[in-house]
């Protein structure tokens, strides 16, 4: 079977790497891919953009692709899965109408409210003055979110009213994030510990994947601006068996049932970004209609089951008949980024040391990279995700940073404390 992975990030490198391990697979194509997928055994890049829906359909038809897995959110929101379905091509991901769950934060919040699924109190605004009046009413700290897709950067955690008002002015008055910021969600600032809960859904049945925890803030100690994610680990100790059951019962099951009841049956990866309160109550911060990045990298390091078989089972509506098996060892991934990220940064720097990382120590998933001759060059903000397994989170962290320290390019940086919460739990 031939497989097509859509996207160009570290998540897509991990998906291609895992799909190529399936005994059912003869060839994996990645459109457009990156420097890492270009050199992955059994994997080939295809020069088609992730949002070129007609081009992807034509390629999949021509190559008789047996399964397409969509990595990023933008093609889903543009209707890629709908186009593949019309062409009779198997594609794992939600249709455009269901992908509104990620494509519009206002849609997601209203959906949660309709179905009684726990989330933060909120207001939705398209006009500046009512938004500012609401801010003055609720006070700070508060969270300001662009309604549409903003590459993980459209969320402002405001500790004071001035920061919140500036964010609202930027979005509704200044055009920051363009159409994505033409409507804003202002919501209650929740406290607790974050966790990422990702499942596969076939329309009715839910197959939960292992838990994970992302690190959104750019700097150590969870400081600095929000990013697409600076590292992740799996499993997340905060998600105990009891909390896992609560998440399934209070969040995932009513979400899937609610979508079906509204005529939006959901098929694909469904990611709930959660805040776990001190009493164990899970509240939804956001939904993503795809795997998280960088959570995918440690998750797929741990997944022992055949990813392709799981996707095919979902397309057949039989996720209730399969299981996902996991390596008991934790995995941890550290994102190496370009200096200046998530703001302005340079590309085109040569990366050295990739060959110095032994495969027994870590796996380097490439994201913002490209090939030029024999060299790998930086080509984005988040450049690599260096991922390792360990007997515990502390060992996985040690091995990941040992590998990170072998890799260099001009102005590379990373957080040095990925996994700190889990390690504190291990030591307590």
Curated annotation (Swiss-Prot):
Return the protein name: Phosphoribosylamine--glycine ligase
Per the annotation, how and in what number is the cofactor bound? Binds 1 Mg(2+) or Mn(2+) ion per subunit.
Any one Gene Ontology biological process term? purine nucleobase biosynthetic process
Show the HAMAP family listed in the entry. Answer: GARS (MF_00138)
Q: So which cofactors does this thing need?
A: Mg(2+); Mn(2+)
InterPro entries xrefs: ATP-grasp, ATP_grasp_subdomain_1, PreATP-grasp_dom_sf, PRibGlycinamid_synth_ATP-grasp, PRibGlycinamide_synth, PRibGlycinamide_synth_C-dom, PRibGlycinamide_synth_C_sf, PRibGlycinamide_synth_CS
Substrates-to-products reaction catalysed: 5-phospho-beta-D-ribosylamine + glycine + ATP = N(1)-(5-phospho-beta-D-ribosyl)glycinamide + ADP + phosphate + H(+)
Q: Which NCBIfam families does the entry link to?
A: purD
Q: Where is the composition biased (Basic and acidic residues)?
A: 213-223
Q: What is its EC number?
A: 6.3.4.13
Q: Keywords of this protein's UniProt record, alphabetized? A: ATP-binding, Ligase, Magnesium, Manganese, Metal-binding, Nucleotide-binding, Purine biosynthesis
| Entries under PROSITE patterns matching the protein | ATP_GRASP, GARS
ATP-grasp domain segment(s): 109-316
